[in-house]
Amino acid sequence: MISAHCNLRLLCSSDSSASASQVAGTTEVVENLVTNDNSPNIPEAIDRLFSDIANINRESMAEITDIQIEEMAVNLWNWALTIGGGWLVNEEQKIRLHYVACKLLSMCEASFASEQSIQRLIMMNMRIGKEWLDAGNFLIADECFQAAVASLEQLYVKLIQRSSPEADLTMEKITVESDHFRVLSYQAESAVAQGDFQRASMCVLQCKDMLMRLPQMTSSLHHLCYNFGVETQKNNKYEESSFWLSQSYDIGKMDKKSTGPEMLAKVLRLLATNYLDWDDTKYYDKALNAVNLANKEHLSSPGLFLKMKILLKGETSNEELLEAVMEILHLDMPLDFCLNIAKLLMDHERESVGFHFLTIIHERFKSSENIGKVLILHTDMLLQRKEELLAKEKIEEIFLAHQTGRQLTAESMNWLHNILWRQAASSFEVQNYTDALQWYYYSLRFYSTDEMDLDFTKLQRNMACCYLNLQQLDKAKEAVAEAERHDPRNVFTQFYIFKIAVIEGNSERALQAIITLENILTDEESEDNDLVAERGSPTMLLSLAAQFALENGQQIVAEKALEYLAQHSEDQEQVLTAVKCLLRFLLPKIAEMPESEDKKKEMDRLLTCLNRAFVKLSQPFGEEALSLESRANEAQWFRKTAWNLAVQCDKDPVMMREFFILSYKMSQFCPSDQVILIARKTCLLMAVAVDLEQGRKASTAFEQTMFLSRALEEIQTCNDIHNFLKQTGTFSNDSCEKLLLLYEFEVRAKLNDPLLESFLESVWELPHLETKTFETIAIIAMEKPAHYPLIALKALKKALLLYKKEEPIDISQYSKCMHNLVNLSVPDGASNVELCPLEEVWGYFEDALSHISRTKDYPEMEILWLMVKSWNTGVLMFSRSKYASAEKWCGLALRFLNHLTSFKESYETQMNMLYSQLVEALSNNKGPVFHEHGYWSKSD
């Protein structure tokens, strides 16, 4: 079977009307949809079908009968109803299927032939329209509702035209009108959603006219208008909201049995509120009338409160207000409601009525267990109006009642404490610490010995803060001790312990408090809200601690606080400032310390702080230029500091590297001028040197690879900087290039880098390389774990060539280079294989002889070594039956013998004798004349 996706292609057409192939495919599409399994192509097929249905009409489907079309439509509709949650079809696609089914059905003439068919079409359009309405597609919803109205009109005509009993006809007309009523309601919903007030109101008024014939729809229309009123009020459309709420009330009155007085009162209260929000001056009377009517319908506390609120908006006299509040008392409203009315009066500056009402309330509810609420509110209102003496009298009254059996509830107690603390905080803010203590003392009096909660410890800390500001140290210590007894793990408790220790000059105690404070901050963040420190930043306490310690001459304590602040603060500027302050304190002290474990610990401490500063510098600054400039300035300071610390670590290379790398990182935030680039290059060079040394000393292959790989990365970065500087033309002869070359060669050689040969190809061609550079390459090439004898040989050849070009030649350096070259070319031992032909090696010996013969400065020990080397080579050749070559090399040794002075007598006799025996043996074709004793070493 062809998939639905493929079939839908038949429906696509560029023409406005459907092609024959389009229509022919429609049947297959629908059949595939309703018979196919849960294919992943189904959602796409539905969407294509929905988009193409607009191009299909009855004329284009002339070859298909009405019965076939109706069957397709019904099957599609029913299939959409059966789709469950396991299908890939969403709710909107189900609506689209219903829509297509309805459009197909409406093309059938049979759908309009019978009343039953028309009713089915009405039902489908109403349902689809409501679904589109709920989905937010109002245009298609309106289209469906219009189609439903048209079908209803057709159905009504058919009812009139046929002859039926009057009773049956009446019932059928009522059914049609009921459907019409629902369609009008839906159309009103759509219009409101689209902001079309005129169309919505016309639909609703039309529904309202139908209520005489459809009384059962009254409640529905009443709630619909109420919902419209709520929605438009939220959107500040007060005029429209007033209309809808008025209609809701009018309609609700038509059927009070189903609506009820509570609902009518609710509508009227919302209407009154709407008038207030619209214009409380212009519509004051309407608002008051609405709320009065609401209270008449159903008296309730919200209605009474709203009425008082409206009265306070107008120019109501105190006498009228007093009458209104007395009415509330006569209605036996609860205490909390009366208190809310009193507060409302106070908030609108009607103090005389408000305080009088409070007095009446107190008398009215004096037997209530919540009578304390009246006194507390009275106290609060007095304090807000600066009537502190009267407020204190009320507090004493509350305390007396509390002590004599009229105890406050927990809720009332919390309320009272909040009022007292608020008043204390106000006094604290204006530095009236004595007055603040009085209010805190009132709060303290209400605590019993078995009620020591966290708020009690907070109270003790607040009192301690006041005592400290009044310089009453002993009382402050007592308060803090009490707080510590109940809440020792509180950051603010530890902060006050710290402050007292600093004031007393007890550095040890202060340090312990700072350490404890840091531990608490590490464990969990405090959300305390004492009078000190910002609530959102517990680390601010560390900043305050550092500042307080400095102000009181406790530098060591301040250093610890700054260190913790830099470690824990998330504030960029705060961390940088803390690190700078700490460094300014520590640098002079560390500079004077002798090399010791203590100095190393201090250096580690500084390194940690500088790394923290680097992390903060790495975080984004603001986009303003000033912020970028500020970061550069900060980085410049830290860069220089790290550099200076690195220089001080000459006895600790590892630590020195850390500071140089840190200086390099800091410099990346600075403008890349020549000075900064040179500094970066130097930092990296020093780091490479340390990493190479670490690699040489590494105890495992893994460690060595790690150090060397890190060095290689640093070398490559350093090379980039050096090449950039060379472009300026002022660093062409910089010795750094040769150093980098040697470093890179050593790293690549010891890492057994496959790119080593290609790297050296460019090295050999570099101009101005010195003999020392080539000799160093030779040494590195043979230094374990590297083993590149051919590279070493080539380097020594180049070095020797450079020595020979010197005028005058440095014969001492020449002799050493020759020694190394010969020793590498012809290793000791009869089993070794030469790295180059002996003819080439012979040339080295001849070259050495030529220089020996021209100067008396050639070191005799080197001449002796060459003599022994050539003699032993001759012996080696003899052992390989290369007799002519043996005679040649031994003869060469005799030539070196002639240039010896102090060592000549020791070797001359024996060598001449052995050489004679060699010549005689060769001429007589005898066996070997050399045995093990024929090999010589320089020490023989």
From Swiss-Prot:
Which SUPFAM superfamilies does the UniProt entry name for this protein?
A: TPR-like (SSF48452)
Lineage: superkingdom: Eukaryota
Enumerate the UniProt keywords alphabetically. Answer: Chromosome, Disease variant, Meiosis
Transferase in keyword set: no
The record's subcellular locations are: Chromosome
Please give the SMART domains that the UniProt record associates with this protein: TPR (SM00028)
Q: In which tissues is it expressed?
A: Testis-specific. Not expressed in adult ovaries.
Family matches, as InterPro entries: Spo22/ZIP4/TEX11, TEX11, TPR-like_helical_dom_sf, TPR_rpt
* Record-level GO BP terms: apoptotic process; chiasma assembly; ectopic germ cell programmed cell death; fertilization; male gonad development; male meiosis chromosome segregation; meiotic gene conversion; negative regulation of apoptotic process
Q: Which GO terms describe its cellular component?
A: central element; chromosome
Give the disease entry from the UniProt record: Spermatogenic failure, X-linked, 2: An infertility disorder caused by spermatogenesis defects. It is characterized by mixed testicular atrophy and azoospermia with meiotic arrest.
State whether it acts alone or in a complex, and with which partners, per the record.
Interacts with SYCP2. Interacts with PBXIP1; may prevent interaction between PBXIP1 and ESR2. Interacts with SHOC1. Interacts with REDIC1.
Report the protein's function.
Answer: Regulator of crossing-over during meiosis. Involved in initiation and/or maintenance of chromosome synapsis and formation of crossovers.
Record's family?
Belongs to the SPO22 family.
Protein's recorded name: Testis-expressed protein 11
What organism is listed for this UniProt entry? Homo sapiens (Human)
Per the UniProt record, the lineage of the source organism begins with: Eukaryota, Metazoa, Chordata, Craniata, Vertebrata
